A protein has these predicted regions:
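Zinc-dependent deaminase catalytic domain
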Residues: 12-164
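Single conserved hydrophobic/aromatic residue that forms the stacking wall/gate
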Residues: 1-14
Length: 164
């Protein structure tokens, strides 16, 4: 649920400041949420915005099939077909940056879900130094162990993780 729905702008800023979320964190998380709506996955929509040290957007991504691969209902509604084929939002953002020659070193990744181990290793290897995701996200039980492992990967690699 969107905790800020229906709240005035002044109140939103006060809530964000009180809980340690800057207006920039709020903006980039909201943008990641908007980008997540571009996903055609019927069960999960995830968005990612990667931001440089000067608050410039370096790359964005959402979960979906690779370029040129038709996203049919049959593929998207069958996990056995979908999972091996789909690119996660973080992967899409990283691959888009690589495709266009943009460095993600020392950037912050704003994501609508905690990164899985697959995305954690990619974010770490890309040089992303901080991950921010909403604290109110409900995680399906089937993902809990994977997300716990990704948090351990981030901790060991000294990648900062913030739940906002």
């Amino acid at each position: 649920p969107d905790w800020s729905r229906g709240l005035g702008d002044v109140y939103k800023r006060q809530v964000c400041i009180r809980y340690g979320m800057s207006k920039w964190d709020q903006r980039f998380l909201e943008l990641a949420k908007q980008i997540s709506t571009w996903s055609k996955d019927p069960s999960t929509q995830v968005g990612c915005v990667v931001v440089g040290p000067d608050r410039e957007i370096r790359s964005t991504g959402f979960n979906g099939l690779p370029r040129g691969i038709e996203d049919t209902s049959e593929r998207l509604n069958n996990r056995e077909i979908k999972y091996p084929m789909i690119c996660h939002a973080e992967e899409n953002a990283i691959m888009h940056a690589a495709r266009t020659g943009i460095s993600l070193k020392n950037c912050v990744a704003y994501v609508t879900w905690p990164p899985c181990t697959r995305c954690a290793r990619s974010l770490i290897q890309a040089g992303v130094s901080e991950i921010v995701y909403p604290k109110e996200v409900e995680i399906p039980e089937r993902w809990e162990a994977d997300f716990d492992m990704s948090l351990n990967m981030f901790k060991e690699s000294k990648t900062l993780v913030r739940k906002e």
